[in-house]
Amino acid sequence: MTSALRETFTGLRDIKGGVLEDAETEYRPGTITLPLFFSKTDFDLEMIKRAVSQVGGEGTRRALGLLCAFVIAETVPSEAGTVAELLEALGFVLESLDTGAPPDATFADPNNKLAETIVKENVLEVVTGLLFTCALLTKYDVDKMATYCQNKLERLATSQGIGELVNFNANRGVLARIGSVLRPGQKLTKAIYGIILINLSDPAIAARAKALCAMRLSGTGMTMVGLFNQAAKNLGALPADLLEDLCMKSVVESARRIVRLMRIVAEAPGVAAKYGIMMSRMLGEGYFKAYGINENARITCILMNINDRYDDGTSRGLTGIKVSDPFRKLAREIARLLVLKYDGDGSTGEGASELIRRAEMASRGPDMGEEEEEDEEDDYSSEPGDSDSFR
């Protein structure tokens, strides 16, 4: 296994070297080295409890690395072998990293209360649940994670049969320490991906694992899906055609890059195809926005105007949508033109670019420049949903 780090895989958060800079650039796992933790030592219960207790303190990185190695070893007899095979099948270059000595007994133990609930019978479930809880900090900031722990962790832990996780220390300082370990550029994130892959390889829990790994939709995203389906039904439009019409021209190329990236992974040959879905785990709204795909508010505005033409009153929900007044006018005009376009067999009419151009002319006048079409910030805040699963 090579130790050369040409690029570090960080859940698509920090891909370096212009991997997605232009429409012709393709994402290639073979250019990325994926560090993988393992252990040469046997795990005993006290070692695991010590590691759990130190999560959130100065020993967090080593403790979580050891816990990842423990779950890998317990899940497959060949230890990291299965994980390595799957990751290599996806095309990654692997670097093997030893977790080293057991956790330092002098480190602080902010999660001691959780560690004390661990016994031989529940150690694997509790540790796995802890790792997946920590993994959420690769997606959510400390404040949002604290809200998640306060509002949803107990219910979710109980539903997953890991009630011990209610003892997880959700102090913001503890969460910040964990987050600093799991942030982009930290090798531990990749070890947690190993846990995800192992779970995917076990048919008994594949459904839960896929729910965890699949790209999650926030409340905003789910609302848009519902609006989109209703609009397609109202218009009698093919969903693909309607989606193309809704993609504002400022975002089309970025959308294509994301689709290309995901297709490359999903179409990987052999066993890798089954695990391609894990690559989308971290593609939340924020990362789509990072590549220019920040049209959620605008598309929602258009969809609600479409549906209002079939169900009077739908547009009342537009009050809280974060778009400018000029765009609200444009959205109404686009909706009107889309209704005209699909008033028939649902497939004829002018293309999206021409339709949007006409709508702009009608709603804003021909003299308005494209400079005012700059994307607006529509970063909706949403809590982690119940689809966050531990196993």
Swiss-Prot record:
Record Pfam families: Rhabdo_ncap_2 (PF03216)
Q: Identify the main location.
A: virion
Gene Ontology MF terms in the entry = RNA binding
The record's section on InterPro entries has: Rhabdo_ncap_2 (IPR004902)
Record's compositionally biased regions (Acidic residues):
368-381
Outline what the protein does. Answer: Encapsidates the genome, protecting it from nucleases. If expressed without protein P it binds non-specifically RNA and therefore can bind it's own mRNA. Interaction with protein P abolishes any non-specific RNA binding, and prevents phosphorylation. The soluble N-P complex encapsidates specifically the genomic RNA, with protein N protecting the genome like a pearl necklace. The encapsidated genomic RNA is termed the nucleocapsid (NC) and serves as template for viral transcription and replication. Protein N binds protein P in the NC through a different interaction, and can be phosphorylated.
| Subunit and interaction comment | Homomultimerizes to form the nucleocapsid. Binds to viral genomic RNA.
Q: What is this protein called?
A: Nucleoprotein
Q: Which organism is it from?
A: Infectious hematopoietic necrosis virus (strain Oregon69)
Gene that this polypeptide is encoded by: N
